[in-house]
From Swiss-Prot:
Name under which the protein is recorded: Protein RecA
Source lineage: Bacteria, Pseudomonadati, Campylobacterota, Epsilonproteobacteria, Campylobacterales
Subcellular location: Cytoplasm
Species name: Campylobacter lari (strain RM2100 / D67 / ATCC BAA-1060)
First and last residue of the signal peptide: none
Binding, ATP: 65-72
Gene name linked to the record: recA
InterPro entries in alphabetical order: AAA+_ATPase, DNA_recomb/repair_RecA, DNA_recomb/repair_RecA_CS, P-loop_NTPase, RecA-like_C, RecA-like_N, RecA_ATP-bd, RecA_C_sf
Length: 344
């Protein structure tokens, strides 16, 4: 670059720094690329699929899927993991349906969880913006986008047409939120529902999410959560097998998948994942229906092996460490211990 151009650029940069603050614009080579911090999800498989050990901090996340697929359960696990690392969390319960007892069973510190049950969509998103701007909240969960009903629709008569009102509300809110959450390093998770496209013909999926296209665009990570099977013991349902696909990922390669057990009343089964990954990595031996680790017989059948690991946390921790070492990601949190390192 010649001297005249350099002087003009320097003058422009100084003017921008003076007007908008130092660091408004930087040359990429002058600044070390910052490491993306993450919040573990409570599932080792999903942490691996996300590529950075969890959901990224300072970003907008969308978790969507059919009803009763495990979306809220997954977000409650993320809240619990964030709290374990000293984070402050807020839950915007637009559906007015949070089960506090269930959240506590999943490890959420409900005594220190901030909760709001807004009356309409504008109020909910205003609350999200205000607490995000404070810089004191590490994680905000909005449950759900479908329940963010615009005030005009609530105050209107039944049958009134409000075409595109919610989509415009979401678009306006996300334009403001994106910069705020990045600057304050706050993660915002929107839970969303699936709807069928009206008049869908030909190619492509007939499914879509509520609230327009803005959330798809502004989200750094989108997780598609689906129930694949019902887990039974003695013909009694005890949980669901859940598959999560990383439909969009701006911080690591997308389209990876993870499967895990979600047990009724307990949430994501850590023991089930230890068995699955232990067998896959040849840490746990599987002979017929029997599972064993070193000299220890874990049990006959997957459910019995899970029960053994639950009753013997020392062996579960040892298998956890072996999986961690085999994967080679030291920062990965498998749920065995709290990570007390370097959190601001």
């Amino acid at each position: 670059m010649d001297d005249n151009k350099r002087k003009s650029l320097d003058a422009a940069l100084k003017s921008l720094d003076k007007t908008f603050g130092k660091g408004t614009i930087l040359r990429l080579g002058d600044k070390e690329v910052e490491k993306i911090d993450s919040i573990p999800t409570g599932s080792v498989g999903l942490d691996l699929a996300l590529g950075i050990g969890g959901v990224p901090k300072g970003r907008i996340i969308e978790i969507y899927g059919p009803e009763s697929s495990g979306k809220t359960t997954l977000t409650l696990h993320i809240i619990a993991e964030c709290q374990k690392k000293g984070g402050v969390c807020a839950f915007i319960d637009a559906e007015h349906a949070l089960d506090v007892k269930y959240a506590k069973n999943l490890g959420v510190d409900t005594e220190n969880l901030y909760i709001s049950q807004p009356d309409f969509g504008e109020q909910a998103l205003e609350i999200v913006e205000t607490i995000a701007r404070s810089g004191a909240i590490d994680l905000i969960v909005v449950d759900s986008v479908a329940a963010l009903t615009p005030k005009a629709e609530i105050e209107g008569d039944m049958g009134d047409q409000h075409v595109g009102l919610q989509a415009r509300l979401m678009s306006q809110a996300l334009r403001k939120l994106t910069g705020i959450v990045h600057k304050m390093n706050t993660t915002v998770i929107f839970i969303n529902q699936i709807r069928m496209k009206i008049g869908m013909m030909g190619y492509g999926t007939p499914e879509t999410t509520t609230g327009g296209n803005a959330l798809k665009f502004y989200s750094s990570v989108r997780l598609d959560v689906r129930k694949t099977a019902t887990l039974k013991q003695n013909d009694e349902p005890i949980g669901n097998r859940v598959k999560v696909k990383v439909a969009k990922n701006k911080v690591a390669p997308p389209f990876k998948q993870a499967e895990f057990d979600v047990m009724f009343g307990e949430g994501v089964s850590r023991e089930g994942e230890l068995i699955d990954y232990g067998v896959k990595l040849d840490i746990i031996d599987k002979s017929g229906a029997w599972f064993s680790y070193k000299a220890s017989k874990l049990g006959q059948g997957r459910e019995n092996a899970k029960a053994f690991l639950k009753e013997n946390p020392a062996i579960a921790d040892e298998i956890t460490q072996a999986i961690q070492n085999s994967i080679g990601i030291d920062s990965m949190i498998l749920g065995a211990k709290e990570d007390d390192e370097g959190e601001e």
